[in-house]
Amino acid sequence: DFSNKFYATPLALVARKGTQLLPQAEALKGKRIGVQRGTVADNFASRFWADQGVEVVRYARQEEAYLDLEAGRIDASWLDALMADGGFLSTPAGVDFAMMGGLIHGRNADEKAVIGEGVGIAIRKQDKDLKAKLDQALAEIRANGKYDEIRKKYFAYDIYGD
């Protein structure tokens, strides 16, 4: 079993600064968007963008997408925001790039079904009391502001979602 979520990894569109791209099919029509094969970002782009005129370019490793992004062979990369922020965007190679158009936790039920509900703490099924205590503690720190206080030390954006 799992506790209620304590974070949900949003997706982010990373592109060269000054680019006016948004993580929406209509805004990306005719663009080449890089994704790591087999990831949530790949599943999302395949389901919601590929048949809307967005060219989804798949890579075995995210680092390959970054190289093509730097070289201008793709217009943007679509990936886990935590990976973008803690990886490429925090390196010298990423200085001219940024997350564009906000983070996506899932704007509707279909998108949320692809992105997922978030990450909870794994608990043995028989530990129902422990699950209840963890769920209560998570709710309390969300309600009293401690969660956001801790989150702001490490992330400049919402990692919880709805």
Language model region names:
Residues D1-D162:
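Proline/Glycine/Serine-rich low-complexity intrinsically disordered segments
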